Amino acid sequence: DSGRYKDGGFYRVVRPDNDNGDPAISVIQGGLLDTTELQAEDLVPHETTDQTGIKHTDGVLSLARRDPGTGSGGIFFICVGDQPSLDYGGKRNEDGQGFASFGRVVSGMEVVRKINAIKETRAVDDPYMRNQILVEPVVIKNAYRKDD
């Protein structure tokens, strides 16, 4: 609601052909491009898909994280296709807690798929993200919550 994603971007694409994790997933990741803007209050308590009932299906938005409770409102991803390994009990994280999903793309999935198909990536130090960080982030012009 604060408009903080305006001028943010999508900077990471993960597909089975470039995924360095197991099991392979397909997502685009984005949010704030300047992560120095992240604050401690941006951390979001972890809610599993078992608690919310929002499974990682095509177009679902979810918080990126390392450990539970380290997800930030400043960094999120969008599922491209169904990604059950990201749900509670899924095998993508050793802790089995999955990722905290919180919304869904209501229009524009064709754009999400085009972003996910971008092949031009840059070198990074983190081997987990090798071949996934875009040379040029795709800018978010606007993002907002749609009321029912």
Report the location of each language-model feature.
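Cyclophilin-like peptidyl-prolyl cis-trans isomerases
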Residues: 1-148
